[in-house]
């Protein structure tokens, strides 16, 4: 087995010249360096159809670099251009798992799984970043994620060879798949089988923690153990088995539905699931789609729903879906309201009685603050929507069946507010889920319906499905 792995490693290390040079993206991407191009080509060869003995001997399976790039863009829900552009490089630079991407909640070739339901694991060594008890707790929780939804049982042993051997290492660490230093590749695991099969390795050049600082060991371990049990990567950005690392927050972790479906395909359900409702990723063309918040941001449109947001570029039809915490780890998972203040290059995010001011990826110092700082009485517990008008300096806030008007210049609430929504904007109903303004029209979202409202004529001019904002 070890000699076979060694032979495979040498084949992977030898890269024949079958690939095509990477084309650049738009004119705005002309500043891509030679280092960017080398990095991108290495990324694509590592995670999209890595060279294997079968692939080398059978030339019909050879995949060009451009084909790999298109597959990578499709996998991550990017616009499939076949060109190396900034959004594609942004994804490539994110910390991730070292296992190649194949798609959905499929399994490794030959549908590898454990034949038994009672499995053992051993923690071979420890990271110096955390206490032994913290490391043990992280792995115990990670195994429980999978045992909660399957008939699998995991028992820790302290010596000898376990089904799943867990270790920390750096660079070359004994399996011929070296780590790359801080960030980048965080960990990898092998599918079920003998020898290395099932083993999980963690890069000790990373800073491992039990919080949002560095990399959360529990989150990475739970992902890698999915591979140890036979799962491949998922295209679903909300899935635990999505290849990119995202800190999911301090709240109780619930295994997403995509992962549940995958692991139960292999092993079946467990006796009693403590979390019978598992979070699902929203589907943009769902006819019943409702939204949580909408805002512009530097020419793009950000559309928030549950733990996610769609990022809609003005020149693209396909919206990109991301976990909110993959961009802003410090924000809550769910957003109540959001708006952009373009002249200040700020985006404001609201959740409950708190709000945040963001400049790009960065939260401004002094935030979060309380919405009472804006002049809301204590009876207002949360906002449902917000929209800013740059030409007047006014911001409208919606809460339950009322609308408030805030003067950004004087930083006070306008007199004669709040007012009833249905009186201020006749015909849109008495609640607003999300709202944004564009070219003299206000777009109000209420459940699966959106209203296009003319500011000049003060009336509804069109009624459309909510999902039409996502080109459905």
UniProtKB/Swiss-Prot annotation:
Q: Where is this motif: Cysteine switch?
A: 95-102
GO-annotated biological processes? bone mineralization; bone morphogenesis; collagen catabolic process; endochondral ossification; extracellular matrix disassembly; growth plate cartilage development; proteolysis
**One GO cellular component term noted in the UniProt record for this chain:** extracellular matrix
Q: How is the cofactor bound, in the record's words?
A: Can bind about 5 Ca(2+) ions per subunit. Binds 2 Zn(2+) ions per subunit.
Binding-site residues for Ca(2+) 4, renumbered to this chain: 292, 336, 384, 433
Repeat (Hemopexin) residue spans along the chain: 282-331, 332-378, 380-428, 429-472
What residues bind Ca(2+) 5, as annotated? Answer: 294, 338, 386, 435
Subcellular location per the Swiss-Prot or TrEMBL entry: Secreted, Extracellular space, Extracellular matrix; Secreted
Query: Could you cite one Gene Ontology molecular function of this protein?
Result: peptidase activity
**Secretion signal, residue range per the UniProt entry:** 1-19
The UniProt record gives the binding positions of Ca(2+) 2 as: 163, 195, 197, 199
Keywords from the named record: Calcium, Collagen degradation, Disulfide bond, Extracellular matrix, Glycoprotein, Hydrolase, Metal-binding, Metalloprotease, Phosphoprotein, Protease, Repeat, Secreted, Signal, Zinc, Zymogen
Keyword check for Protease, yes or no.
yes
InterPro entries linked: Hemopexin-like_dom (IPR000585), Hemopexin-like_dom_sf (IPR036375), Hemopexin-like_repeat (IPR018487), Hemopexin_CS (IPR018486), M10A_MMP (IPR033739), MetalloPept_cat_dom_sf (IPR024079), Pept_M10_metallopeptidase (IPR001818), Pept_M10A (IPR021190)
Gene ablation phenotype (knockout): No visible phenotype. Mice are born at the expected Mendelian rate, are fertile and have a normal life span. Mutant embryos show a delay in the development of the primary ossification centers. Besides, they display an increased length of the growth plates of the long bones from the hind limbs. Three week old mutant mice display an increased trabecular bone volume due to an increase in the length of the hypertrophic chondrocyte zone of the growth plate. This phenotype persists during several months, but one year old mutant mice display no longer any difference relative to wild-type.
Identify this protein by name: Collagenase 3
């Amino acid at each position: 087995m070890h000699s076979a792995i060694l032979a495979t490693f040498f084949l992977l290390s030898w890269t024949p010249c079958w690939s095509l040079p990477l084309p650049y993206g738009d004119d705005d991407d002309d500043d891509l360096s030679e280092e960017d191009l080398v990095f991108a080509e290495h990324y694509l060869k590592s995670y999209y159809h890595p060279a294997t003995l079968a692939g080398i001997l059978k030339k019909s399976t050879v995949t060009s670099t451009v084909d790999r790039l298109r597959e990578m863009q499709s996998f991550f829900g990017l616009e499939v251009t076949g060109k190396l552009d900034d959004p594609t490089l942004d994804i490539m630079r994110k910390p991730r798992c070292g296992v190649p991407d194949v798609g959905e909640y499929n399994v490794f070739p030959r549908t590898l799984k454990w034949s038994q339901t009672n499995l053992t694991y051993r923690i071979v060594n420890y990271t110096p970043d955390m206490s032994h008890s913290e490391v043990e707790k992280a792995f115990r929780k990670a195994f429980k994620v999978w045992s909660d939804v399957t008939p699998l049982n995991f028992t820790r042993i302290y010596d000898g060879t376990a089904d799943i051997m867990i270790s920390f290492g750096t660079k070359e660490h004994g399996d011929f798949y070296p780590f790359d230093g801080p960030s980048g590749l965080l960990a990898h695991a092998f599918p079920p089988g003998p020898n290395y099969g099932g083993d999980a390795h963690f890069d000790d050049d990373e800073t491992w923690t039990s919080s949002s600082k560095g990399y959360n060991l529990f989150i990475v371990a739970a992902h890698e153990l999915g591979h140890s049990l036979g799962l491949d990567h998922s295209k679903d950005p909300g899935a635990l088995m999505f290849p990119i690392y995202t800190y999911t927050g301090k709240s109780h972790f619930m295994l997403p539905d995509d992962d549940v479906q995958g692991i139960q395909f292999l092993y079946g359900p467990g006796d009693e699931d403590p979390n019978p409702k598992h979070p699902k990723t929203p589907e943009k063309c769902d006819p019943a789609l409702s939204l949580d918040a909408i805002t512009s941001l530097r020419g793009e449109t950000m559309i928030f729903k549950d733990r996610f947001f769609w990022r809609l570029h003005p020149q693209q039809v396909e919206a990109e879906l991301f976990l909110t915490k993959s961009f802003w780890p410090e924000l809550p998972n769910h957003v109540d309201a959001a708006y952009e203040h373009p002249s200040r290059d700020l985006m404001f995010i609201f959740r409950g009685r708190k709000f945040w001011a963001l400049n790009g990826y960065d939260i401004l110092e002094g935030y979060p603050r309380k919405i009472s700082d804006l002049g809301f009485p204590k009876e207002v517990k949360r906002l449902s929507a917000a929209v800013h008008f740059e030409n007047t300096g006014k911001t409208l806030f919606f809460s339950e069946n009322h609308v408030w008007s805030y003067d950004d210049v004087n930083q006070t609430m306008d007199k004669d507010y709040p007012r009833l929504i249905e009186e201020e904007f006749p015909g849109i109903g008495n609640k607003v889920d999300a709202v944004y303004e564009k070219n003299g029209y206000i777009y109000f979202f209420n459940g699966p319906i959106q209203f296009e409202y003319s500011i000049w004529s003060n009336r509804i001019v069109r009624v459309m499905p909510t999902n039409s904002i996502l080109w459905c």
